Amino acid sequence: MRHRYSGRRLNRTSAHRKAMFRNMAVSLIEHEMINTTLPKAKEFRRVAEPLITLAKEDSVANRRLVFSRLRDRKAVTKLFNELGPRYQARPGGYLRILKRGFRAGDNAPMAIVELLERPLPDSQEE
C-alpha cells in the first residue's frame, strides 16, 4: 500500500529531482517567473515556499540554511534583500500557478509559476 508517501517522484532519481528543483528555485528567484509542466509546478511549490518563508527573517543561520539548499550566492542575496522584505506581511502562499495549455511535442500540461506581487517589466507599465 502507498499510504503516507508524500510527494511525486516525477520519474527521476532522488538526486535528479533535488537538482531539478534547486535549478528551478534559482531560476524563479532570478526571473520571478518560470514555465514548466503542471506536475513539476505543483511539486515545486513545496520546495520554493519554505525558502521565501526563511528569507523573511534575515539571519546568518537562515542565509546558511537557504544557501545549503540553493548553492547560489546571487539567488540567496536577492532572496534575502528583495523577496524576503516584499513578503514580510504575507503569511504564506507566495507563488501563483497558472495553467497555460499543452506542450506541442508531447501534449504535456504546462504551467506558469510566478511570484505574487512581482513588479511588471518596463514595457508593460504604460
Curated annotation (Swiss-Prot):
Ranges in coiled-coil conformation: none
UniProt-listed PROSITE patterns: RIBOSOMAL_L17 (PS01167)
Molecular function as annotated in GO: structural constituent of ribosome
One of the GO biological process terms: translation
Keyword Ribonucleoprotein: yes
One Pfam match: Ribosomal_L17
UniProt keyword Transport, yes or no: no
InterPro entries reported for this sequence: Ribosomal_bL17, Ribosomal_bL17_CS, Ribosomal_bL17_sf
Keywords associated with the record: Ribonucleoprotein, Ribosomal protein
GO terms under cellular component: cytosolic large ribosomal subunit
Protein family per UniProt: Belongs to the bacterial ribosomal protein bL17 family.
Record's subunit section: Part of the 50S ribosomal subunit. Contacts protein L32.
Name of the featured protein: Large ribosomal subunit protein bL17
